[in-house]
């Protein structure tokens, strides 16, 4: 009963509901940690990959990518004619740049989860067959250049490192009780 229990859930609301159900059934619910899959994966990376241990959060999370992308898009006006035209439109340019950077950061976050091979392939820049996505590959390459000490610490790269580590190392994981609850579908990296 005193062993820490980690529950991987699809939403914080579901986590709260589970804690209430456990408390109702057992009279108390303590030492229960409900986490989203991405949070669990970051903790897994930190437990197995030494380079991630000093980082509280990923340098590639959407909020950080928003600000980095904003700076890099602004510094590279030749990145995409479409972006240049959009930013030249009416209204507050800085607001438009921020909102665009935020959308791109969220898109990259989804790519890291659902299209990891794209991101791994893009580290060297765009390829001929990418067409309209070539500016995205170029922006990703600029982000990677801007983070030379962390380029191997994005979700797609970390996932490969963890799988390799789990195949070759017998290190015990820090969880004694781990449950997955209410996840009907999961992307490849989860």
Cite the ranges covered by each PLM segment:
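Conserved RecA-like ASCE P-loop NTPase motor core of nucleic-acid helicases/translocases
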Residues: 2-14, 179, 183
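Basic/charged alpha-beta structural segments of nucleotide/phosphate-handling enzymes
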Residues: 9-173, 188
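Flexible, charged surface loops at secondary-structure boundaries
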Residues: 1-3, 167-178
């Amino acid at each position: 009963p005193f062993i820490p229990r980690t529950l991987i859930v699809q939403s914080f609301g579901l986590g709260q509901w589970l804690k209430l159900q456990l408390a109702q059934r057992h009279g108390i619910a303590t030492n229960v940690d409900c986490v989203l899959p991405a949070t669990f994966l970051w903790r897994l990376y930190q437990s197995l990959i030494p380079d991630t241990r000093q980082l509280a959060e990923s340098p590639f999370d959407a909020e950080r990518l928003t600000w980095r992308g904003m700076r890099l898009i602004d510094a590279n006006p030749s990145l995409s004619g479409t972006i240049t035209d959009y930013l030249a439109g009416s209204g507050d340019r800085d607001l438009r740049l921020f909102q665009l950077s935020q959308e791109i950061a969220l898109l990259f976050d989804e790519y890291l989860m659902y299209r990891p091979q794209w991101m791994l392939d893009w580290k060297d820049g765009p390829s001929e067959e990418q067409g309209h996505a070539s500016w995205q590959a170029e922006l990703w390459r600029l982000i990677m250049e801007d983070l030379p000490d962390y380029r191997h610490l994005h979700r797609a790269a970390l996932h490969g490192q963890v799988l390799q580590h789990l195949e070759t190392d017998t290190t015990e994981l820090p969880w004694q009780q781990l449950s997955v609850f209410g996840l009907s579908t999961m992307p490849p990296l989860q």
